[in-house]
Regions:
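Radical SAM/AdoMet-radical enzyme domain recognition
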Residues: 1-82
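Structured core elements
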Residues: 7-9, 50, 78, 138, ...
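Short acidic/His/Gly/Ser-rich catalytic and metal-binding motifs that mark active-site loops
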Residues: 14-18, 86-89, 207
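Short clusters of hydrophobic/aromatic residues that line enzyme substrate/ligand-binding pockets
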Residues: 17, 119, 139, 168-171, ...
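Short, flexible helix/strand-to-coil boundary loops that buttress conserved ligand/catalytic motifs
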Residues: 21, 158, 208
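A C-terminal junction/extension of Radical SAM enzymes
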Residues: 87-163, 203, 254-255, 259-264, ...
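Flexible mid-to-C-terminal extensions adjoining Fe-S/redox cofactors in radical SAM and related proteins
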Residues: 161-268
C-alpha cells in the first residue's frame, strides 16, 4: 500500500512457474499466488507494478510466458534471463543466444501495435532516456543505494549478500566501508573497457555488477552473453518505435519512398 512500485515474481505459464517456484511442501505456487497478484494489481490504481519472471534454458520459448501473463490481466510485464556461472544448469549460455534472440524478435512481432502489454525491455525512451549519471553508471549499487540484511549487515545490493568481501558495514554498529562504496562509484561505461565502443552503452550503462562478478569474477568485466541479449532487446525496441512512428512503412500506399520530404501527396 505504501510502495509507489511493486515487483511481483511469477515466471509465466503454470508448468514453467511451478517447476522453478515450488512451495515448501513441494507443490506448485502458481494457483496460490496468481489470484493474490491479480487482487493486488486491481487495487493499485495508478501506482506502478511489474510482474517479473525469469526464463532459463528450460523455457527458451519465453514469449509464450509473456503472452500468458498478459492473458491474466497483467499489463506491465518483464521476463529476465537467468544468469550464473558456466556450470549453472539454468543460466543462459552462449550457445543459447540464437534461440533467445529469435524469441525476442518473435515477441516484438507479437507486441507490435498492442497497448495491453508494456514489456519492460522494449519500453525504451529514445528521445530523452535516463539522466546522464544513470546512462554512465547504471543502477548505482553500493553508492546510490544498498541492501540491508535482517542482521543489519550492509551490502552493495541484494545479490552481494553473503559475500564477505563485499560486506560494507552494519547499521547496528554504525560502521560503513567507503572504500567498497568508492569502487562501485567509479564504475561506468568508460572505466569498463569492454563497454567503451559498444553502441548500446548509454542504454545498458555497463550491465549488472553482480552478474559480472558471478560470471567473470570481476565487477568491471561485463557478462558477454548478457551484453548480446541487451543489444538484441534494444534492437527490437528501436524497431518497434520506428514502426510505430511509420518509418519505412509502405503498407496500403502506392508510395515506395521513406523520405516524406520528396513529395506532398501523403498530406493531401
Amino acid at each position: 500500500r505504501e510502495m509507489s512500485n511493486v515487483v511481483l515474481s511469477l515466471d509465466g505459464r503454470r508448468e514453467v512457474n511451478d517447476h522453478m517456484r515450488p512451495t515448501v511442501n513441494g507443490k506448485g505456487s502458481y494457483d496460490v499466488i496468481v489470484p493474490k497478484f491479480q487482487q493486488l494489481v486491481s487495487q493499485r490504481g495508478t501506482k506502478d507494478y511489474y510482474v517479473r519472471g525469469t526464463f532459463t534454458r528450460e523455457n527458451l520459448d519465453f514469449a509464450d510466458d509473456v503472452e500468458h501473463l498478459a492473458s491474466l490481466g497483467f499489463r506491465h510485464v518483464s521476463v529476465e534471463p537467468a544468469s550464473g556461472p558456466l556450470d549453472d544448469p539454468f543460466a543462459i549460455k552462449e550457445g543459447d543466444l540464437p534461440a533467445v534472440e529469435a524469441e525476442y524478435e518473435k515477441l516484438a512481432r507479437q507486441l507490435q501495435g498492442r497497448k495491453d502489454v508494456n514489456f519492460f525491455h522494449f519500453n525504451v525512451d529514445l528521445a530523452q532516456g535516463p539522466c546522464v549519471i544513470k546512462r554512465l553508471r547504471g543502477c548505482g549499487a553500493g553508492c546510490e543505494y544498498v541492501a540491508i540484511t535482517p542482521d543489519g549487515d550492509i551490502y552493495p545490493c541484494h545479490q552481494f549478500v553473503g559475500r564477505e568481501e563485499y560486506r560494507m558495514g552494519n547499521v547496528r554498529s554504525g560502521d560503513f566501508d567507503m572504500d567498497i562504496s568508492g569502487k562501485f562509484a567509479e564504475l561506468n561505461i568508460y572505466t569498463r573497457e569492454d563497454c567503451r565502443n559498444c553502441w548500446a552503452r548509454f542504454y545498458c550503462s555497463g550491465g549488472c555488477s553482480a552478474s559480472n562478478l558471478l560470471v567473470n569474477g570481476d565487477i568491471k568485466k561485463p557478462n558477454a552473453v548478457a551484453c548480446e541479449m541487451e543489444r538484441k532487446r534494444l534492437e527490437c525496441a528501436i524497431a518497434l518505435r520506428a514502426i510505430a512512428a511509420g518509418m519505412g512503412e509502405t503498407e496500403n500506399t502506392e508510395c515506395n519512398n521513406t523520405d516524406c520530404s520528396l513529395c506532398g501527396s501523403c498530406a493531401e
